[in-house]
Amino acid sequence: KNKSCERGTKIHAEFENSMYQNPEKELKRYGLGGKFSVKKGHYRLDTEKAVYPEFLISVKSRDGVLRVAGQIDLLIKDGNDIIIIDFKTNKKIDRKSYYNKSTKRYECLKYPLNTIQDCNLMHYTLQLSMYAYLLQQINPDLNIKMLKLIHIDHSNKVEEIEVEYMKKEVEVLLKHYKKQLLIKEELSKDTPIVY
């Protein structure tokens, strides 16, 4: 497991370094042209054309109940268009979950996402969708142009997978989680006082 983590860290670092050396070359792959600034450690999306490696994002709900944070491997901003890229270095990307022969169904995530297959492709799709949703909470004018996984398997084969923006599912998940937090808080008020 340590070797896998080290490999993933090394691949992330190599890509990040290539961004600093020649961002224009790297961005042509995504149909983008022109000069882009590379903004390492800069967390305000105030530049018209910019690349943000390892972009930290944190959003608190208006009522203060929820705080969600994450780190986007690569965020590209072209005007209001946003591209989110995440690197995965695991052995494989599973596109289907385990098929249970006795129930004749694929395993799904827990409620409220219990219609979504429980496989790493869907986990990663939800992860990138959460990032996109959080960005739109910060600035509703942002347009999510693309969510992409770049998978580098253990034989160094690279596969780019464009994933769907599951905004509705993210909203359902956050609403459910917030409700659970509020219920837990209410129940904690009923605990007896010990003298």
Predicted regions and their residues:
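Metal-dependent nuclease catalytic cores that hydrolyze phosphodiester bonds in DNA/RNA
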Residues: 1-69
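Short, flexible/disordered intra-domain loops and linkers
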Residues: 95-103, 115-118
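A structural signal for short, well-ordered beta-strand segments and their strand-loop junctions
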Residues: 52, 83-86, 146-151
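Short, mixed charged/polar active-site loops
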Residues: 65-69, 82, 158-160
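Conserved catalytic cores of phosphodiester-cleaving nucleases, focusing on short active-site segments
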Residues: 12, 70-96, 105-110, 131
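Short, flexible loop/turn elements at secondary-structure junctions
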Residues: 55-61, 76-78, 89-91, 151
